């Protein structure tokens, strides 16, 4: 069996009668699906535990995600292979705490609010692959290393170091954020995953059958960057927003790397190094996108390639 614990925010205030109505429907639905657990309403926050067969629990949570009465759903814990239920006698025990002592309610609301906010903040700083592990009930620290082929994308801002010395910290930060926002949105829209930000640089990856999607991501990012430049208005630095992109394809090792102090879920391999070198060549060639030969060979569209010859990659044997 599987168990999921989540917290969410009610989209509107609920009276005791409205909550009781929700409780009755919840009991009926969960009884039919043989899902047990507990549902707590404290102020504007729902806290719920669902337990049962995996397919039934997943379907129940998916239904809740589409329920307009819930927003900001944060999955706190997922457990698999449970041998027994924690709430075997309840189809869905419901608890309404809003009529309890005001001091207790205030403390509970603060706790749930802080929990939801902390979770949201951590999600913003956490690798999507790590979040998926957690939501699937897998400890990322125990996940095995996997060797697989990936399309690696590196992107960075042209002349960033030079521009940084002439403008305020706020303008430089806004400049970098605008670029990273454009590229990140394009990456996710095309099915890729942003792996990390490194100052003005971004590293992302795609599955090997998404070579053309990765190229489209670069082209769409450049188009959006041109749009931002043409609409710079009073934003001085935006007039100088240019970027370079490098693509490589090859085997990498994906997993958690680091130390006892800090871990990073990322990818390692020669393809990563090659993609980083590719983006550096955009400066000397005057081309906004540089790809290595295996990317070109794996693409299925006619991209009107321009052969620029062979380049010696620093650190490569040949």
Which residues does each PLM region occupy?
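Charge-rich, low-complexity N-terminal segments
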Residues: 1-154, 162
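Short beta-strand
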Residues: 37-42, 193-197, 237
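A short glycine-enriched loop-to-beta-strand structural element that forms part of the catalytic core
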Residues: 74-76, 80-84, 238-256
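Catalytic NTP-binding/metal-coordinating core of nucleotidyl cyclase/transferase enzymes
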Residues: 142-213
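Alpha-helical scaffold within the catalytic cores of cyclic-nucleotide enzymes
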Residues: 177-189, 208-245, 249, 274-279
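Catalytic/regulatory signature loops of cyclic-dinucleotide turnover enzymes
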Residues: 248-249, 270-293
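Short, surface-exposed loop/helix-turn segments at secondary-structure junctions
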Residues: 257-269
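Cytosolic regulatory/linker segments at or just downstream of nucleotide-handling modules
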Residues: 284-318
């Amino acid at each position: 069996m599987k168990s999921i614990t989540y917290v969410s925010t009610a989209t509107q205030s609920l009276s005791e009668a409205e909550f009781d109505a929700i409780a009755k429907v919840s009991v009926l639905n969960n009884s039919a699906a043989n899902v047990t657990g507990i549902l707590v309403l404290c102020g504007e926050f729902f806290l719920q535990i669902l337990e049962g067969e995996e397919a039934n629990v997943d379907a129940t949570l998916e239904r809740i995600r589409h329920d307009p009465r819930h927003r900001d759903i944060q999955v706190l814990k997922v457990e698999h292979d449970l041998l027994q239920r924690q709430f075997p006698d309840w189809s869905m025990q419901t608890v309404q705490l809003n009529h309890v002592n005001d001091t207790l309610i205030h403390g509970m609301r603060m706790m749930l609010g802080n929990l939801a906010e902390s979770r949201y903040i951590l999600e913003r700083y956490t690798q999507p692959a790590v979040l998926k592990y957690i939501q699937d009930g897998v400890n990322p620290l125990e996940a095995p290393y996997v060797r697989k082929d990936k399309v690696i994308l590196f992107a960075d801002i042209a002349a960033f170091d030079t521009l940084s010395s002439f403008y305020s910290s706020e303008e430089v930060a806004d400049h970098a954020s605008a670029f990273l926002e454009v590229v990140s949105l394009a990456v996710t829209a095309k099915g890729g995953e942003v792996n990390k930000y490194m100052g003005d640089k971004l590293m992302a990856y795609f599955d090997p059958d998404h070579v053309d999607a990765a190229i489209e991501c670069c082209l769409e990012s450049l188009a959006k960057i041109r749009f931002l430049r043409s609409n710079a208005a009073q934003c001085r630095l935006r007039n100088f927003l240019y970027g370079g992109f490098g693509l490589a394809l090859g085997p990498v090792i994906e997993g958690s790397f680091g130390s006892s102090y800090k871990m990073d879920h990322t990818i390692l391999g020669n393809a990563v190094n090659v993609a980083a070198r590719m983006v550096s060549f955009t400066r000397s060639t005057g081309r906004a996108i540089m790809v290595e030969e295996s990317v070109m060979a794996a693409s299925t569209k006619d991209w009107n390639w321009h052969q620029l010859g062979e380049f010696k990659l620093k650190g490569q044997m040949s």
